[in-house]
Design a protein with these regions (language model features):
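N-terminal localization/anchoring segments of enzymes in phospholipid and broader phosphate metabolism
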Residues: 1-534, 552, 556, 568-686
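Short alpha-helical
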Residues: 274, 544-545
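Polyanion-binding catalytic cores of nucleic-acid enzymes and NTP/SAM-utilizing transferases
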Residues: 546, 550-552
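Hydrophobic alpha/beta core scaffold segments
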Residues: 559-563
Length: 686
């Protein structure tokens, strides 16, 4: 049978490669290009710790899956490693042939080995002795007795030595040591004294390599290479666990994350085979876990690379704007009572949402606030404002998702802090994740008779830090049907049965039936010779059932544009997908919004909300999607989608071989960079 879907993880690697390509764009500020190498590397680290770790567990028989066999999992891990190795060549090429020369052009000399100019020899030697040497603790490595534990995602230097005076062939002549780089004590990147117009930088590991003779007196240094281990970081919670059991499992398993099973052993590919073989045997590394790297590993650290030359063009992002209709003296409540409000972050300031909560804290007629928490910032202003509301006599209910990956500890800590302040905390639902990003404020008039509710439905988290980095949209509305639906959703989260939703689309209830109805209507229009039109913007498209519906629509003549940032398992360019185009946008901000357009014969229907079209989102999570009913806001989202589809600078097509194909060029004046164009569009409207 023909394979009609890309493999999820291979598709993700195609996205991450597109991230890497931003480092090659010489129209960007230099340090923004460097940051994209950091993002690429950080993404890859998490990918191995979660996705590859899962496949490896299945391949070794340590875990079971209904979707993979031992053989298919092993083959997929091999395919992933081959693609990562291929991308490594481009990462090295971009770094060495693009980034380093660009730094030199700006008089920033970044040493790439232990060899430095003679005028820096004394500095390197003195800096090592005074700042680094006290924190080094070499540990011997033996095949028979490993006495060191390699910590997750920490950089180590593996050293091979010859004992001076020992005859060739004697058993103790060749010895091996490992040293953890003292990241917590000394920066990864060291600034050396400026000479003339030139600034100099150096990796800490290269300074250590230049002084190995000081660390190991009595030995001759044979060679040294960097290594690192990535460990399985996934946390599996028993679906049958109750709330208290979930809390205990999260606490225990988060602690074990740092000592999880090895899923990747990364090493300097210049390491001789016999050196590598020794380490593999000593640390009991599975050969399938071996991933060659460059001489400098953990390139995610490049986000901390110093910029000593202030004349280098800084990273300049659009600054969040505040709507003039919502200055601090204006009531958001009164505005939303008259007209729905749509905000787009980070173009609009997240302060507007904070002000919405702040107004709820201090408005005497507000009785209750309800919010979902998936990922919040540390020392969160949102959480602090909710605590202030509880202390001010408001009833506050927060649903806390403890199973939000890598945010488990923060969510648990903030939940305990809120609970201590008198907030009603509802924890994770067994067997489900709650991914909906919704808030509800209930307010009665001064006589206590009329109830007015204010709903907020968003594509992004209530996180003031990521709201400056992720491109998301959120709707404020007092629409009575949507508000009532949101009431029902919060009742569902509190354990009430059989909710009914009329306008809000909620995963595991009415979302799939409504999506099928919307797609069917576009198919019927196309079959009648009318225009069938679908535009879907999301982070990931993976669910085979929904992909098949899009294939069906394409074959019926529906024109479909997909704006998918990351995973896309739909294969374009086939007979069954000839009317489907896949666009991917990677730029300054992380595209995170989920916005859906259905042409509806000229009376378009638009929606925004939290789910991607992945099986986990559609079938195993609680997600919320709202229709956009206000004609002006509908047009605003249509314009946003149109701007993104016309992007000729940061958008590319994904072809039938998962290649990122740049869109055909146009005259320079017509080139659209959608994030910046949309920012200007919104600025003109304020």
């Amino acid at each position: 049978m023909e394979n009609r879907y890309f493999k999820r993880d291979i598709s993700w690697l195609s996205f991450n490669y597109r991230v890497l390509l931003e480092a090659e764009d010489d129209t960007l500020p230099l340090y923004e290009r460097i940051n994209f190498i950091s993002i690429y590397s950080s993404n890859l680290e998490e990918f191995y710790k979660i996705r590859v770790a899962d496949h490896k567990a299945i391949a070794t028989g340590a875990s079971q899956s209904d979707e993979e066999t031992v053989q298919s999992a092993a083959e997929l891990v091999d395919e992933i490693n081959r693609e990562v190795n291929r991308q490594l060549e481009d990462r090295i090429r971009i770094y060495e042939q693009k980034i380093l020369p660009a730094l030199r052009k700006h008089h920033i000399i970044f040493y790439q080995s232990r060899n430095v100019e003679p005028f820096h020899n004394d500095f390197v030697r003195n800096f090592f002795r005074e700042e680094i040497f006290p924190y080094l603790a070499p540990v011997p490595v033996s095949k028979d007795k490993v006495i060191s534990f390699l910590r997750d995602n920490r950089l180590y230097l593996a050293v091979r030595l010859h004992l001076k005076g020992a005859p060739v062939g004697s058993p103790n002549r060749i010895q091996y040591f490992v040293m953890k780089l003292p990241y917590s004590k000394v920066p990864r990147f060291i600034q050396l004294p400026k000479v003339g117009k030139d600034y100099y930088l150096m990796f800490i590991e290269d300074i250590i390599k230049a002084n190995l003779d000081t660390i190991f007196p009595g030995y001759e240094v044979d060679s040294s290479y960097c290594i690192k281990i990535s460990r399985d970081a996934d946390i599996l919670i028993d679906d049958a666990a109750n709330t208290s059991e979930i809390i205990e499992q999260v606490k225990k398993k988060v602690k074990k994350r740092k000592i999880g099973a090895v899923c990747r052993f990364v090493y300097d590919r210049a390491m001789p085979q016999d050196f590598l073989d020794f380490l593999v045997d000593a640390y009991r590394i599975d050969r399938r876990e071996l991933v060659p790297g460059d001489k400098h590993l953990n390139m995610e650290d490049l986000r901390h690379l110093p910029n000593p030359n202030q004349s280098v063009r800084p990273i300049k992002k659009p600054q969040p704007m505040k709507l003039t209709c919502l200055d601090e003296r204006e009531s958001i409540f009164r505005y939303v009572e008259k007209k729905d409000l749509l905000l787009h972050y980070p173009y609009h300031s997240f302060d507007h949402f904070i002000h919405f909560l702040y107004e709820a804290v201090h408005e005497p007629t507000v009785r209750e606030i309800m919010v979902t928490q998936y990922r919040v910032a540390e020392n969160s202003t949102v959480i602090n404002t909710l605590i202030a509301a509880a202390q001010n006599g408001k009833k506050v209910t927060v649903f806390v998702e403890l199973k939000a990956r890598f945010d488990e500890e923060n969510n648990l800590a903030t939940a305990e802090m809120m609970k201590a302040a008198g907030i009603n905390i509802i924890f994770s639902i067994p067997g489900l994740k709650v991914h909906a990003k919704v808030a509800l404020v209930l307010r009665r008039d001064k006589e206590g008779r009329k109830l007015t509710s204010y709903a907020y439905i968003s594509t992004g988290n209530f996180n003031e830090k990521t709201a400056t980095l992720y491109a998301d949209s959120g709707l404020f509305t007092c629409n009575p049907v949507i508000v009532n639906d949101l009431h029902n959703l919060f009742r569902t989260l509190q354990g009430k049965e059989n909710p009914v939703f009329h306008r809000l689309l909620v995963a595991r209830f009415n979302l799939i039936p409504e999506l099928n109805r919307l797609i069917n209507h576009e198919i019927e229009l196309a079959r009648q010779g009318k225009q069938g039109r679908i535009i879907l913007k999301m982070n990931a498209l993976q669910d085979p059932a929904m992909i098949d519906r899009l294939y069906e629509a394409s074959q019926a003549g529906v024109e479909i544009d997909l704006i998918v940032r990351g995973i896309c398992c739909l294969i374009p360019g086939q007979e069954y997908s000839r009317n489907i185009r896949v666009t991917r946008i990677v730029d300054t901000f992380l595209e995170h919004a989920r916005v859906w357009y259905f042409g509806n014969g000229g009376a378009p229907k638009l929606f925004l909300g939290s789910p991607d079209w992945m099986r986990r989102n559609l079938y195993r999570r609680i997600e919320a999607v709202t229709p956009i009913l206000d004609p002006d806001l509908k047009q605003e989202l249509i314009d946003m989608l149109s701007i993104q589809l016309s992007d000729k600078r940061k958008a590319c097509f994904v072809d039938d071989r998962l290649r990122n194909r740049w869109k055909s060029s146009r005259p320079q004046k017509e080139k659209v960079r959608s994030q910046y164009s949309f920012y200007e569009y919104l600025r003109e409207k304020i």
